[in-house]
């Protein structure tokens, strides 16, 4: 006698594994900076169908530029282009309209709306560690990495 719950779980895991991962900037930076969840990003990067939309490269570049300078930003982009990922350089009309609706209906940044729209239109699992994406729970499959915790250092 088969346990139907077990079969359902196994088939949903297999279904999740067949869907591509789409990495948000927060997930990619976790991998680059070896933060909590970097191992999960590394596993996703080993899959042949992992996706990186252009806003992730844009954010990675400008954040790195601000924090570590242009040389490091250039180095990171060069390394990202060597990864076994599909970089999504173009945005079609359906992705644009999906992003616009997400931005209109939810409290998320424009970049996050575009990144989520790419995931929705590509039937991908959005891997992130950005609590802003919590607003989109139920709209697309997501794998949240451990969020950063900020310690209040104020003296009372």
Spell out what each predicted region is:
Residues 1-18, 116, 120-156:
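Acidic, PIN/NYN-like endoribonuclease modules and their adjacent C-terminal/linker elements
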Residues 67-71, 106, 143-147:
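Short, hinge-like loop/turn segments at secondary-structure boundaries
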Residues 2, 86-129:
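Active-site neighborhoods of divalent-metal-dependent phosphate/nucleic-acid chemistry enzymes
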Residues 1-52, 65-78, 150-154:
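Short, well-structured N-terminal submotif of metal-dependent ribonuclease cores
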Residues 46-48, 82-83, 122, 139:
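Structured helix-beta-strand junction loops
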Residues 63-66, 85:
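Helix-loop "lid/cap" segments that line or gate small-molecule binding pockets
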């Amino acid at each position: 006698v088969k346990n139907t719950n077990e079969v359902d779980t196994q088939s949903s895991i297999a279904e999740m594994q067949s869907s591509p991962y789409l990495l948000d900037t927060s997930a990619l930076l976790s991998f680059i900076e070896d933060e909590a969840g970097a191992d999960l990003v590394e596993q996703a990067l080993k899959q042949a169908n992992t996706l990186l939309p252009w806003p992730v490269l844009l954010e990675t570049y400008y954040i790195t530029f601000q924090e570590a300078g242009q040389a490091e930003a250039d180095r990171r982009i060069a390394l990202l282009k060597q990864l076994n990922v599909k970089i999504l350089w173009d945005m079609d009309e359906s992705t644009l309209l999906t992003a616009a609706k997400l931005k209109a209906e939810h409290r998320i940044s424009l970049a996050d709306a575009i990144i989520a729209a790419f995931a929705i239109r590509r039937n991908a699992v959005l891997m992130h560690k950005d609590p802003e994406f919590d607003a989109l729970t139920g709209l697309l499959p997501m794998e949240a990495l451990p969020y950063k915790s900020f310690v209040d250092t104020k003296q009372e």
